């Protein structure tokens, strides 16, 4: 059976009440949505409440994370014809999925300069951490507002345990406090503007980190930008206005892959004893 004839890959996303293509909101999950759309891989999709993620992946015999607070997370895919790490053909975690899809569907390449592009993606992910942590303070309290009741209870409880205080207390109550976080986050993001701009006039063309060639490193940046686009348009516009429009150019060149959708398909979740 050829890749065009086989059953489509299935993509598992996190449920939200956001409208239209904004329903998909998690930056980690959106990385794989971008990969699927960029490569033109046919896929079906289903959306799942937070407390259903562990029983879903357990039922598919996906090996749990060996480290971290959560043993099971989205994104995940199910594609028995290519995934051999579990009996069901399912796997989770954005970077392993991205690498698997790039090997299975090599054109167009997700790492256009090979190992150098892979190293760039790892570097972007590491450099993103300070800005992402600051953004958590601003946007996590808004994220809980778009979840279903069961998802909200789970999200608030687990994130309160992680941060050591209620999510409602993460975002400063004063404009000065918010401005301090925003300015700090923007300072953390200046390095990405420099990388997108290149060494000087005429040295680089194209809106992507590697010029005219998009890659997974770009998707890490774009999905981070999408978080503010989903939850705080004023913040998103402020980020877009940074530098000489480098973020805006990257966004407009990439949004088609961010917003693309698969075919909706119901995927029942068995009721199992679970761990987070």
From Swiss-Prot:
Disruption phenotype: Does not alter the production of ustiloxin B. The gene is ustS. Belongs to the GST superfamily. Glutathione S-transferase-like protein; part of the gene cluster that mediates the biosynthesis of the secondary metabolite ustiloxin B, an antimitotic tetrapeptide. First, ustA is processed by the subtilisin-like endoprotease Kex2 that is outside the ustiloxin B gene cluster, at the C-terminal side of Arg-Lys, after transfer to Golgi apparatus through the endoplasmic reticulum (ER). Cleavage by KEX2 generates 16 peptides YAIG-I to YAIG-XVI. It comes from Aspergillus flavus (strain ATCC 200026 / FGSC A1120 / IAM 13836 / NRRL 3357 / JCM 12722 / SRRC 167). Keywords: Transferase. InterPro entries: Glutathione-S-Trfase_C_sf, Glutathione_S-Trfase_N, GST_UstS-like_C, Thioredoxin-like_sf. This is Glutathione S-transferase-like protein ustS. Its EC number is 2.5.1.-. SUPFAM superfamilies: GST C-terminal domain-like, Thioredoxin-like. It comes from the Eukaryota. Pfam families: GST_C_7, GST_N_3. Residues 16-109 form the GST N-terminal domain. The keyword Cytoplasm does not apply.
